[in-house]
């Protein structure tokens, strides 16, 4: 497992694609759930970080 860490729009997905890694984005997962009616407290908004505690609770 390789973690690519960076802020929104920093190129994490681009780097994964460049080197042939599978890109699993927490933000993408939240957006998919949001489209299915599981938007949590107005998150995720573009450029905002999701609080770690909320994320851990949400995906347990």
Swiss-Prot record:
Its main location: cytoplasm. It catalyses: a ribonucleoside 5'-phosphate + ATP = a ribonucleoside 5'-diphosphate + ADP; AMP + ATP = 2 ADP; dAMP + ATP = dADP + ADP; dATP + AMP = dADP + ADP. Its EC number is 2.7.4.3, 2.7.4.4, 2.7.4.6. Gene3D superfamilies: P-loop containing nucleotide triphosphate hydrolases. AMP binds at residues 26, 31. InterPro entries: Adenylat/UMP-CMP_kin (IPR000850), P-loop_NTPase (IPR027417). The modification Phosphoserine is found at residue 25. It is found in: Cytoplasm. Keywords: ATP-binding, Cytoplasm, Kinase, Nucleotide-binding, Phosphoprotein, Transferase. Disulfide bonds: none annotated. Its cofactor is Mg(2+). Consists of three domains, a large central CORE domain and two small peripheral domains, NMPbind and LID, which undergo movements during catalysis. The LID domain closes over the site of phosphoryl transfer upon ATP binding. Assembling and dissambling the active center during each catalytic cycle provides an effective means to prevent ATP hydrolysis. PANTHER family: NUCLEOTIDE KINASE. Belongs to the adenylate kinase family. AK1 subfamily. Catalyzes the reversible transfer of the terminal phosphate group between ATP and AMP. Also displays broad nucleoside diphosphate kinase activity. Plays an important role in cellular energy homeostasis and in adenine nucleotide metabolism. Also catalyzes at a very low rate the synthesis of thiamine triphosphate (ThTP) from thiamine diphosphate (ThDP) and ADP. This is Adenylate kinase isoenzyme 1. The lineage of its organism: Eukaryota, Metazoa, Chordata, Craniata, Vertebrata. The gene is Ak1.
């Amino acid at each position: 497992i390789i973690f690519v860490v960076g802020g929104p729009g920093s190129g994490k997905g681009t780097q994964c694609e460049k080197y042939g890694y599978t890109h699993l984005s927490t933000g993408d997962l939240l957006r998919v759930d949001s489209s299915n009616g599981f938007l949590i407290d107005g998150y995720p908004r573009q450029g905002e970080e999701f609080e770690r505690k909320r994320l851990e609770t949400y995906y347990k």
